Amino acid sequence: MKSPFNELSTGSGYFWRGFPLLNHPGIRRYVIAPLLINTLLFAALIYFGAEKFDALLDSLIPAWLDWLRWLLWPIFAILSLFVVFFLFSWVGNLVAAPFNSLLAEAVQARLTGVSPDTNTGWLGFARDIAVSFLPAVLSELRKISYFLLRAIPIGLLLLVPGINIVVPFLWLAFSAWMLAIEYSDYPMGNQGLSFPEQRRRLNGRRMLSFGFGAMVLLATMVPGLNLLVIPTAVAGATVMWVEEHDRK
């Protein structure tokens, strides 16, 4: 039996083991498609936001204060970067949800040698995405409700003197747990495991789960790396499922 420290270390390592799997044939398209959609979405939002911001400056700043634009545009650029940094992974989870189950399936096929019953070619790829769309959205809504039912009470603890000093640490632990649930849902859901059963499995290897979730949380805070956190975490969670949970 592994020590808690070894479990944490092993769990964190599974995130990084997902990264080299992303470039394999048959897996790559499930990474590129949602990343491209998410990038185009944010690019469009920033473009239209810049147009509206420029129009706002035209209406508010008189000609003799035109030099203020040189101060305000860098502020807009910095705020845009903050929005992308903090929201990219969150929005990306919603955009990538229909792709992630198929990504987990493709990664598991790569690891086990058992081919999934998915269609080949781009037409089949589009059909698979369409079929998985509704179940993926329902799964995300279920996880969001689970998150809110626990996040709100934790947030309310901030109002309690004395206890509020431990809330940041509690929030970090809860975030790591939620990320383990978020990404383990894809390989486990592919096997037909219910949400309560998924949580039971993860809770049975709690330190392993926390190690994985903590590394995902850390990676989301690194600019650049956070763009690939979602597919890497899905692939890593699938490796963790195959090696640690599938035998149970």
Task: Label the predicted regions.
Residues 55-60, 191-196, 236-239:
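Short alpha-helical linear motifs
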Residues 9-22, 166-212, 227:
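Nonpolar helix-loop interface/hinge motif
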Residues 73-109, 158-190, 224-247:
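Selective recognition of hydrophobic, aromatic-rich stretches within alpha-helical transmembrane segments
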Residues 41, 47, 59, 196, ...:
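Juxtamembrane helix-loop transition sites at the ends of transmembrane segments
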Residues 201, 205, 221, 243-247:
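Hydrophobic alpha-helical segments
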Residues 1-147, 151, 204-209, 213-216, ...:
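Helix-coil boundary and N-terminal low-complexity module in membrane systems
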